[in-house]
Amino acid sequence: MFSMRIVCLVLSVVGTAWTADSGEGDFLAEGGGVRGPRVVERHQSACKDSDWPFCSDEDWNYKCPSGCRMKGLIDEVNQDFTNRINKLKNSLFEYQKNNKDSHSLTTNIMEILRGDFSSANNRDNTYNRVSEDLRSRIEVLKRKVIEKVQHIQLLQKNVRAQLVDMKRLEVDIDIKIRSCRGSCSRALAREVDLKDYEDQQKQLEQVIAKDLLPSRDRQHLPLIKMKPVPDLVPGNFKSQLQKVPPEWKALTDMPQMRMELERPGGNEITRGGSTSYGTGSETESPRNPSSAGSWNSGSSGPGSTGNRNPGSSGTGGTATWKPGSSGPGSTGSWNSGSSGTGSTGNQNPGSPRPGSTGTWNPGSSERGSAGHWTSESSVSGSTGQWHSESGSFRPDSPGSGNARPNNPDWGTFEEVSGNVSPGTRREYHTEKLVTSKGDKELRTGKEKVTSGSTTTTRRSCSKTVTKTVIGPDGHKEVTKEVVTSEDGSDCPEAMDLGTLSGIGTLDGFRHRHPDEAAFFDTASTGKTFPGFFSPMLGEFVSETESRGSESGIFTNTKESSSHHPGIAEFPSRGKSSSYSKQFTSSTSYNRGDSTFESKSYKMADEAGSEADHEGTHSTKRGHAKSRPVRDCDDVLQTHPSGTQSGIFNIKLPGSSKIFSVYCDQETSLGGWLLIQQRMDGSLNFNRTWQDYKRGFGSLNDEGEGEFWLGNDYLHLLTQRGSVLRVELEDWAGNEAYAEYHFRVGSEAEGYALQVSSYEGTAGDALIEGSVEEGAEYTSHNNMQFSTFDRDADQWEENCAEVYGGGWWYNNCQAANLNGIYYPGGSYDPRNNSPYEIENGVVWVSFRGADYSLRAVRMKIRPLVTQ
């Protein structure tokens, strides 16, 4: 076996050597040596080597690149390009997402801006309307102030003329007395004090010399003008608007406002800042945010020195202007928590009266009425106070007979920034007015009594501590504590009240109107003056609080009374005469059913009737109550909110009851009191006599509802003569009215109806009645009131039972506003059960007897302004 291997090896070596040494043979010569396709054997390791060198041109013939190398290069480049493309795609998706979010956010912002611009535009328009309305009201107030100033100047001239006449009269009397001394057995020793007249004239001239009119710089109010800005975008930027997105173009559609402040009488125009804020942009001037306004009225009253700034009340101060009556002697009530220069309390400027040297509370329509005296500013001839809540009258006049205490302390009032407003007031009461039962003459102070009657003098003083606490909810609690000294031992040096130095002294002259006939009796004898206090004193009450102010209906009910800080109230019970027998604190003044008492006391008049007055603690708390309003015309003239229609409290003449009525102040001249209304048929008007006597139904604050006021009230309201207004409306919306002079009799007279002097568009159905049936049978004039349980008509049967409601029936009707309410208008009487008759809400001369009206109203107002 081994030998065979050796043999094979030898043969192989020999063959190889033979082949290598042999030359070209015939095979190669015949072309057998041509290179042809060969079977390529793949090596497993060929493509595993990734580090192949590049093929150059020189190497291409004998060393070419392999397909594996080419594939590797292609894959590498492809992967690189794929990565780049994916990166670009991711960036594109992220940009699209951000762009979408940005667009959504921009759209939301634009919607918010549109809403804000629209709200700002509405606020600008509202501000423009309110400012114009405020300016017009201020102009009206300025005109009223000028009228009052002119009235004051006229009264001052009259006072001066009367003073001259009185001086001349006293000189004439002195001449006559001197002339009869030679012929008379006994003459009166009398001296004429002309120096006192000269002093009074000088003081009066000083008062007249004061300029009450507003200063020239305040005669013309600035005018605020608001107008839209025409070109919001400057011209050089308009071309760029074409390139902006549509949502941004929407900003140019929002109108912007420009505010300008023009001062009449000058060329100065004050504009606000130049910045606009889209719709309703307003340009404002810098202002003090803590001040609610400023009104420097200058010298606004006789004897007033310095400026009062009631609008700028400072920290914790509030200022409220509540207009009052437009009638004579009443311009409203201004209560300022920060009273201004020279004042330490509330100032209630109103209507100064002739002879007064301060400022009076409004609501004083009577000549010579003193009203509510709270002046503490510098006043020529008088710097005292008169607080009606305590009733203390503290004169400080240099006139004869008056002396100021050595330690005057008329009270202090402090407003703090918190909710607690402490105040302390000391009051000193001096000698009192005392009269004896046998002498009808009232004397004051230490004046000698010429008759045989006895006069006593008493002194008392009191110290009042008032603390006002305002809670976080706005509730205001007033606590008062008064310490009274009956013997006057704790008083400082007291002053004489109204002491007269002799006949002809004019000490009380400034507190009374010279035109009154009882003027001379008042000056010489000291008698109380009826009507000295305004019947409308309590109608103007302003509650000044640190958080605001509010007003209400300032009338007392029968069972309980509404107390208002700073304003005293009359007790509603007790009737007293004008001559008081005994006093324990100060003077009483009476007018009709109303009594003003400065302190709590028991008072007996000459007839022996007594009226008890209430107080707090051991104090003698003052109560003052004005005459309540009688009707809606009175409300219109005196109530702070009387110019607006609504529900008000009134007190009927001749009655002690106070009740609520609805006043229509918008129709015609205003002052209409609603006495009957039908609107929807929700209330049955087929009622008893007692129901119609007392009234029934109800109204809401807007005057909607069905009701009948009551025949008793109609009688009391129409005793002095009234105007009846009947308003009718059919189902098509057509309206008509009828007006009559109107009066309703008493219950003893059957509440008889008296009408005359028809005017209107509805036709005269109450006097002329129905033309077809004749006025004799259908006129309602002079007819008594009838109900189904009390028949007073002219028909043999009961008209009220048949026609469905109480009315002033004849035989039977041409008008019946209390009939059965049929919706729709025209109705067929044959369908009515149980009586087939025209018993709807009818006014024959307007729509016929077979047409039931949709709405009817009956209103009354005084025939003449009372």
Curated annotation (Swiss-Prot):
CDD domains listed in its UniProt record: FReD
Composition bias type Basic and acidic residues, residue spans: 424-449, 594-617
Outcome of substituting R38N: In Munich-1; requires 2 nucleotide substitutions
Keyword match 4Fe-4S: no
Molecular-function GO terms, alphabetical: extracellular matrix structural constituent; metal ion binding; protein-macromolecule adaptor activity; signaling receptor binding; structural molecule activity
Subcellular localization, as worded in the UniProt entry: Secreted
Pfam families for the chain: Fib_alpha, Fibrinogen_aC, Fibrinogen_C
Compositional bias annotation for Basic residues: 618-627
Region: Alpha-chain polymerization, binding distal domain of another fibrin gamma chain, residue numbers: 36-38
Covalent link Isoglutamyl lysine isopeptide (Lys-Gln) (interchain with Q-?), residues: K527, K558, K575, K581, K599
Modified residues annotated as Phosphothreonine in this record: T412, T505
InterPro entries assigned: FIB_ANG-like, Fibrinogen-like_C, Fibrinogen_a/b/g_C_1, Fibrinogen_a/b/g_C_dom, Fibrinogen_a/b/g_coil_dom, Fibrinogen_aC, Fibrinogen_CS
Binding site residues for Ca(2+): D791, D793, W795, E797
Modified-residue entries (Phosphoserine), positions: S22, S45, S50, S56, S281, S291, S294, S364, S451, S501, S524, S560, S609
SMART domains: FBG, Fib_alpha
Fibrinogen C-terminal domain location: 623-864
Phenotype upon changing R129P: In CAFBN; hypofibrinogenemia; heterozygous; no effect on fibrinogen complex assembly; no effect on fibrinogen complex secretion
Modification type 4-hydroxyproline: residues: P565
Position(s), cross-link Isoglutamyl lysine isopeptide (Lys-Gln) (interchain with Q-41 in alpha-2-antiplasmin): K322
The organism's place on the tree of life at top rank: Eukaryota
Glycan-modified residues: T320, S351, S453, N686
Biased composition (Low complexity): 270-299, 450-460, 575-589
NCBIfam families: GGGWT_bact (NF040941)
UniProt-recorded name of the protein: Fibrinogen alpha chain
Record lineage: Eukaryota, Metazoa, Chordata, Craniata, Vertebrata
